[in-house]
Structures are given as structure tokens and as C-alpha cells.
């Protein structure tokens, strides 16, 4: 794992003015009541695995100590499983933090950000706080990243961001297209591939590519398929020199030991990913089939979320469903008639179908 150097800690002082300007997050809404069906944040309905919960409980006894050893151990295990060097893995308090630090490190007033739209908004927010130009490129007709258009959007770009599978659509960008982005991106820029949802899909990961490419950063999280959104553990994978540039902003901010040990236990549970992937796919496909049978269009998702064209202002549909206790995702401005739905449990998806049918019967 990349080490936190004295140099990076000193540089953090210079970075503080930038961090102070960051729009770290839009104000969070109050927690939903227990009886609400929460299909709005792409969370797992299952939470941490049994092994992860046990490891997290045991970690409480050591909470009086800084968990650096647990952090290094997690990085080492992930590196071993992926066939890469430990120095190519850095651990953060969620992959969102690593993504924000990447934008701060790789963009500036003369080196912009290129990303798709609709997509995850955090990099755009971070770039705007940096006063870096942002070029948002529409998804193509298959709802994948339009890589040729992204490559042409800004010849001086400092960072290209690809979320694969994409949030909010759940759709995939082909591996060959991502290779094209890596080969043809502006000189001196960094390609950041966000694989928060990759384990739900059938696509190969880009993690192994970091062995040959020092201008590629891959992000992973334990918030989605591992069900640990509240524990805040994420990974950045790349060349040590790239990770040092992130450490300037991340400093010595080690995640909590409970999350680190829960994450390690999750990686050690070899049955967890295939079980959850299959269960998610079953719930997703049966719901999409049901929605399409009623005349609505859905995105071809390989994630734990999908989008529906509701044929009317999406805000209205979100409000109607919320009134019946079913919370679904927000609206993306260039897709104003589409809603994002997180894939929940069997009970939650049954309730979603019941309420959706009742509220959309006249469409």
C-alpha cells in the first residue's frame, strides 16, 4: 500500500484552501422511517455479510488504537487477490473521497474534467469547486459512454471520468472503448474508471491494467454489493506516484477499524459476491420485465439500479411514490422524464411494483 509520507502531510497544508471550497455534499435528507421502502441511494438491502458483521463486532475491542495495521492488511489482501502490488492500492473512507481527491489532483483552471451525462455528479461538483472547466458528454444511443466524443471534448483535459457500470443508468461501456480512452486521451491526463458497481456486472475489471499503465486510476467501494455503505471503506488502485498525489489531499485519514475488518472479512468470503450478484440480477430482471410489459422503457442495466422513462416529469412520479412510502432516486437534468430505481429485496420490489402500478395506471 502507498505510504503516507512527510511530504504528503506537509502538502496537505497547501491543499486546505481547496478543501475548504469543496461542495462536499448536498445537505442530506432526514433518515427515512423504518416502514419506508428505500430504493433511492443504491444501497444494499442486505447489509454486511455475517462474517463481516462478526469481524466488525470484534473490532470494537481495539477501537482505542489507530487501525493502520488493519488498513495495510486490507490493501495487501486486495492486491494479492487481484495480482497487483500492494503499493498500487490505497484505502480511503469511501471511494467518494478518493474520487474527489483525484479531481483535485488531476484538474485545474487550465486542465479540465471530461465526463458523461447523466452520470455520478461528484466529480463535476469537485471540479467546479476547483474552478476547473467541465465538459459533459451525452451517453450514446446504447446509453454507454461516448468515448470518441469524450476524447474530442477537451484536448487539454486533465482527467477523464468513466463510471462503469454507469450510475444512474446501470449500463456498461465496452472494454474496448475504455482501452481506446486510455490510449487516445490528452497527453498528461489521467483516466479514472469508477468500478463501484462492477461486481454486479459480467464485465471484466480494469484493475489489472494498472500494472502497465501509470496514467490509470481505478476506484472500488465496499458500499454496494458488500452492503457496507455506512462503514465508509473504498479503494483507489493505480501507480504509486498517482496515489501519492491523492494522499496530498487525503493525508493520514485512516478509515475506522470496524469498517476495515468488515471489508477484509467480505473479501475473504468467496461465496458472497456470486450469491449477491445472482440475487440482484434476479430481482432487477424480473422488475424490468414487469415494467416493460406495461409499456415503459428501461435502461439495460448490469448494476443494482436501473432507469425508467416515465413519460412525464420525473419529479412528479418521485413525489407520488414517496407519498405511498416508496422512495426512488433523484432526477438528472438532461433526462427529466427518467427515474432511477435501486434494486432492493424481494419484499421491497414487490411493494415498488404495487405502488408504481397504482400511480402510473393512467399513463
Model-predicted regions and their roles:
Residues 1-17:
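N-terminal secretory signal peptides and thylakoid transit peptides that target proteins
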Residues 13-65, 80, 156:
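N-terminal "arm"/small-domain region of PLP-dependent enzymes with the aminotransferase-like
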Residues 49, 215-299:
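PLP-dependent aminotransferase class I/II
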Residues 73-112, 130:
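Phosphate-binding glycine-rich loop
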Residues 105-162:
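PLP-dependent aminotransferase-like
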Residues 147-155, 171-191, 195-225:
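Active-site pre-lysine segment of PLP-dependent enzymes
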Residues 285, 292-361:
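Conserved C-terminal alpha-helix-loop-beta "cap" of PLP-dependent enzymes
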